[in-house]
Curated annotation (Swiss-Prot):
Enzymatic class: ligase
GO annotation terms (biological process): cell division; DNA biosynthetic process; DNA recombination; DNA repair; lagging strand elongation
Organism taxonomic ancestry: Archaea, Thermoproteota, Thermoprotei, Desulfurococcales, Desulfurococcaceae
Note describing how the cofactor binds: Less active with Ca(2+) or Co(2+). Not active with Cu(2+), Zn(2+), Sr(2+) or Ni(2+).
pH-dependence annotation: Optimum pH is 7.5.
Superkingdom of the source species: Archaea
Activity modulation comment: Inhibited in the presence of 100 mM KCl, NaCl or NH(4)Cl.
Protein name per the record: DNA ligase
NCBIfam families per UniProt: dnl1
Subunit and partners: Monomer.
């Protein structure tokens, strides 16, 4: 399949703000894509070479090398490329302009670089992908020159619009405004006959978190082929998500009256896969984090009595002397890429297991929670550092509250309340009332922290002048696949955290508002939705400045957080895992009820 129609689709997507129109455009693109190429097209739309859990290396092409490649491809000087970049602010547009200016496919000479990348023929989707893959896989001595030749050759053969989006892909700034939810909608329209097919496609994706694979199966064999998709060891399952609650009696009513209540540990949620002697560990974001936890690998080898298993648990840092639970920040030292065995000794961990999703060929995701817990108990060999999560089963709000206080006292951040009725299946990738989290009271009107996405930033004044020192934060609206703003956060940062924040933001700054962001506020810099932070505030309030739940409570206003304060970064969460607009609306309504209750009693 030629790459040009894909690049032209990217150009159209960039101009479209309506999710409906985006879905229709994607539907047309998918229908015109051969089944053998559709997986690659989906990966390119996602801006990646494959699912995160595969752990493929990054392309490793910095800005300077990209400038060199553009200059080499179009016989321009690097100084000219840099001048244009400073003027335009986008290397993709620079490549498009130079390609149009210096090349046409009929007149282009075959350079050494073009020969290295394939010889001057029209670009195909597969050639673009394969070349980008080769660039990523080029490692070690001489890899910089290999990357330069491959990329310059690809750009030399690219038409202007193709060059623009190849460069943006390499930069990691594709910016076409399409999330996974929109891709699923389009696959349902293209190959399932309409929206009624989406639940089947989405469930398959939730069980086999590889959107390219799902697209290829549905394109080749139809929606019915996806009904048979089951968990597979080595392929992470998208995690089941919980709603949040505050009142024990209300929570028990929501889950059906009786529930299992477990400690909610302040650590890294982990999905642990075992097949024979091999063990893989995946984060909440489905990233392969096996390297960080060689001790957990050994625990799983010895502590799971099954040939094949997929279990879920929480990895927490513990005190090496007494095994008491340590704060989440201590665990984050495990993210170091070097000296992991030394860090392992300094920061030992414990694993608290709470679910079994697959055991020896049996898919347990369709089984109710009591059966999954029974299977988990059967296969786990407990030790002080590898054990089942602390839990009770109850229908009594008082007992739930007492257990909650005990959890807080013992270092947990709250409890998870889980339904036990016959429909208490594992709803992969779905947030619902089968699980409800009850977290600690932070002694403020806003009873819980929220996880919000950075979409913009502002420069500070005084001693913080010249540095980005406050953030524009957004929630996630899953119905529309967008990020409406909630608040501006300027407090809670230490000087060290500000320095780290500025480094983190560098690679995510973009020249204009991201297509999936809704904002009435113009920050000093726009940031692509990628970073998630935990925020605590005094209360939820109505705001004419923010777009979260706009026009929902009252015309013309949204919901905002008063006196927001930064708590910590949530590296374990993707933007789509952030607190949703539905959750914020529910929190606001509960807050109103608390305020109104005393007046009603008078």
């Amino acid at each position: 399949m030629p790459f040009k129609p894909v690049a032209e689709a990217f150009a159209s997507m960039e101009r479209i703000t309506s999710r409906t129109q985006l879905t229709l455009l994607l539907t047309r693109l998918f229908k015109s894509t051969p089944p053998g190429a559709i997986g690659i097209v989906v990966y390119l739309i996602q801006g990646k070479l494959g699912p995160d859990w595969k752990g493929l290396p990054e392309l490793g092409v910095g800005e300077k090398l990209l400038v060199k490649a553009i200059a080499l491809a179009y016989k321009a000087t690097e100084e000219r490329v840099e001048r244009l970049y400073k003027s335009v602010g986008d290397l993709g547009s620079v490549a498009e302009r130079l390609s149009r200016e210096y090349r046409s496919r009929a007149a282009r000479a075959v350079t050494l670089e073009a020969f290295m990348a394939g010889g001057g023929e029209a670009l195909t989707v597969r050639r673009v992908y394969n070349t980008l893959y080769r660039i990523a896989m080029a490692q070690g001595e001489g890899s910089r020159d290999i990357k330069l030749r491959l990329l310059a050759g690809l750009l030399a053969d690219a038409e202007p619009v193709e060059a623009k989006y190849i460069v943006r892909f390499v930069e990691g700034r594709l910016r076409v405004g399409v999330g996974d939810a929109t891709v699923l909608d389009a696959l349902a329209m293209a190959f399932g006959g309409g929206a009624h097919a989406r639940p089947v496609i989405e469930r398959a994706y939730n069980l086999r978190a590889d959107l390219g694979y799902i697209a290829e199966v549905v394109a080749r064999e139809g929606v019915d082929a996806l009904r048979g998709v089951k968990p597979q060891v080595g392929v992470p399952i998208r995690p089941m998500l919980a709603e949040r609650g505050r009142d024990p009696a209300e929570i028990l009513r929501k889950v059906g009256g009786r529930a299992v209540v477990e400690y909610k540990y302040d650590g890294e949620r982990a999905q642990i896969h075992k097949k024979d002697g091999e063990v893989y560990i995946y984060s909440r974001r489905l990233e392969n984090i096996t390297r960080m936890f060689p001790d957990v690998v050994e625990m799983a080898r010895k502590g799971l009595k099954a040939g094949e298993a997929i279990v879920e648990g929480e990895i927490v840092a513990v005190d090496p002397d007494n095994y008491e639970i340590q704060p989440f920040q201590v665990l984050m030292q495990r993210k170091r890429k070097h000296d992991i065995h030394r860090v392992m000794r300094e920061v030992p961990v414990a694993v608290f297991l709470f679910d079994a999703l697959y055991v020896d060929g049996e898919d347990l995701t369709s089984k109710p929670l009591p059966e999954r817990r029974r299977r988990l108990k059967e296969i786990v060999v407990e030790t002080p550092l590898w054990r089942l999560a602390e839990s009770i089963e109850t229908s009594d709000p008082e007992e739930l509250w007492t257990f909650f206080l005990k959890a807080i006292e013992e270092g947990a951040e709250g409890v998870m309340v889980k339904a036990v009725h016959r429909d208490s299946v594992y709803t992969a990738g779905v947030r619902g009332w089968l699980w409800v989290k009850l977290k600690r009271d932070y002694k403020s009107e806003m009873m819980d922290t929220v996880d919000l996405v950075v979409v913009g930033a502002f420069y500070g004044r005084g001693k913080r002048g010249g540095k980005l020192s406050s953030l524009l934060m957004a929630a996630y609206d899953p119905d529309r696949d967008v990020f409406p703003t909630v608040c501006k956060v300027a407090t809670g940062f230490t000087d060290e955290e500000l320095d780290r924040m500025n480094e983190m933001l560098k690679k995510h700054i973009i020249p204009r508002k991201h297509p999936r962001v809704e904002s009435r506020i113009e920050p000093d810099v726009w940031v692509e939705p990628a970073l998630v932070a935990e925020i605590l505030g005094a209360e939820l309030t109505l705001s004419p400045m923010h777009t979260c739940c706009l026009n929902t409570v009252r015309p013309g206003v949204g919901i905002s957080i008063r006196f927001p304060r930064f708590i910590r970064w949530r590296d374990d969460k993707s933007p789509e895992d952030a607190t949703t607009t539905h959750e914020l609306l529910e929190m606001y309504k509960r807050q109103l009820r608390r305020v109104e209750e005393p007046a009603e009693q008078v």
